[in-house]
Amino acid sequence: MYEWLNALPKAELHLHLEGSLEPELLFALAERNKIALPWNDVEALRSAYAFNNLQEFLDLYYQGADVLRSEQDFYDLTWAYLQRCKSQNVIHTEPFFDPQTHTDRGIPFEVVLNGINQALKDGREQLGISSGLILSFLRHLSEEEAQKTLDQALPFRDAFIAVGLDSSEKGHPPSKFQRVFDRARSEGFEAVAHAGEEGPPEYIWEALDLLKIKRIDHGVRAIEDERLMQRIIDEQIPLTVCPLSNTKLCVFDHMSQHNILDMLERGVKVTVNSDDPAYFGGYVTENFHALHTHLGMTEDQARRLAQNSLDARLV
């Protein structure tokens, strides 16, 4: 079944480029940039990938991102991910990047963007993988800082297809960023947002009504609100669900408890994605395979999930 799932044409719509930084590349970039790491070797770093919640993961995620310094570093990060896409027949990807993770460390916005964009361009030309980049604001930072990031992005307007919202969800509702998203949409950006992962269904309502998003990233807690579920079904609003991430971060205690197939059968436009694959133990195919192994996902369900991902593209 793994080989069949791997060969299935699919799109990935929920992937953080910084979260695809594999330990081997992290160590190579640390050596290139002469950065001392708190782990002795790759295996020690892998063993640190034991999280009890989103915040514990994010602490390690931001620490790992510190090795990314130059355009070449961001190119290498993105190119490694695209090669993985090619090996798993991901024919289209819409990755996130978090400029504030890097600009707050003194890395110029254009250094980050140039490295990523050159890799995406090469991916289109050399690998045949179409793509669109999403600029994501960090919700644990202030609205003012998000506005500054949008200011930095506007000269490069054509480099992005959308703005997004990620990082620590609890205590940071979408409404905090309503004015930023209003402005981004007035500049021609589409909008997506993480909502309903650790946060309540109310955050999904806010993302839909205040941020006016086209896609819900995660959204698994929508199932707790019947009226919300009906709206998502009626309007066919896509959900970019990340099964391995959800179990690794204890959104669900075990994959056998995941609700993605329940939502699929109710008519929700759910998709399968890897989120931060270097940290969560699998890329898109591994996420599909986990659904087959633990939930008995059928070939028909897999085809529908893959088709949903292709249908839910912004570009």
UniProtKB/Swiss-Prot annotation:
Obligatory cofactor(s): Zn(2+)
Organism superkingdom: Bacteria
Catalysed reaction equations from the record: adenine + H2O + H(+) = hypoxanthine + NH4(+)
Active site: E197
Site positions per UniProt: Important for catalytic activity: H218
Residues binding Zn(2+), per UniProt: H14, H16, H194, D275
Annotated keywords: Hydrolase, Metal-binding, Nucleotide metabolism, Zinc
Residues reported in the UniProt entry to bind substrate: D276
Pfam families per the UniProt record, alphabetical: A_deaminase (PF00962)
GO cellular component: cytosol
Cofactor descriptive note: Binds 1 zinc ion per subunit.
Disulphide bridges: none
Record function comment: Catalyzes the hydrolytic deamination of adenine to hypoxanthine. Plays an important role in the purine salvage pathway and in nitrogen catabolism.
UniProt-listed PANTHER family: ADENINE DEAMINASE
Stated name of the protein: Adenine deaminase
Source species: Pseudomonas putida (strain W619)
